[in-house]
Design a protein with these regions (language model features):
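HKD-type phospholipase D/PLD-like phosphodiesterase module
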Residues: 1, 10-187
Length: 187
């Protein structure tokens, strides 16, 4: 294998408050560990992970998983959501005119509850305000090459997101040139 391209909307362990006796499969750490092991076993393997800024709460709660992947030499790209159409146009206009320039870069100590986690985690006002745009890259795909040099991949409804671990999902496996347009759209 020469390369692996992954594009997932949700790649995190944030799951909100759990009811007594409730648990989730740790999908995000399982995938993180598998990618790190693969990169360590084959250092020349080029791995690209494209994911959404929601995974670090729009900068308000940086993802340790994404940081570990970057530290191992895996390319991690956060989708530039500003390039997407507004899904909440009334708010998004207000965001650009009155909040975006004023709210800083979103780093620093947070004081608002993390909307995605039930624990003590806190995020900045900017993180909350940016999330209200409701923009997201909902793609879920994996493309790589096999030992014969053929393109192989899946397009799925699943996310490596702990709180999504109990969801029912579907996927289609593809092979060959049918994956070229998807691959070209990712790189």
């Amino acid at each position: 294998r020469d390369f692996l391209v992954l594009d997932w909307f949700l790649f995190n362990d944030q799951r909100g408050a759990l009811a007594p006796g409730e648990s989730y499969r740790p999908l995000s750490s399982q995938l993180r560990d598998a990618l790190l092991a693969r990169k360590q076993a084959i250092p020349e393997l080029r791995i690209l992970l494209v994911t959404d800024p929601i995974n670090d709460v729009s900068g308000g709660d940086p993802s340790a998983d994404l940081a570990a992947l970057r530290a191992a030499g895996i390319d991690v790209i956060l989708t530039d959501l500003d390039q997407l159409r507004d899904s909440n146009p009334i708010y998004s206009g207000f965001w650009r005119a009155a909040i975006d320039w004023w709210a800083g870069d979103g780093t620093g100590p947070g004081w608002l509850p993390n909307p995605l986690e039930g624990g003590p985690s806190r995020v900045t006002f900017r993180a909350w305000a940016r999330l209200l745009n409701f923009k997201a890259n909902h793609r879920k795909l994996v493309i790589g090459d096999n030992s014969a040099g053929e393109l192989v991949g899946i397009v799925a409804s699943a996310n490596p997101h702990d709180a999504s671990s109990a969801h029912s999902n579907v996927a289609i496996a593809l092979k060959g040139n049918a994956l070229l347009p998807l691959l070209q759209s990712e790189i």
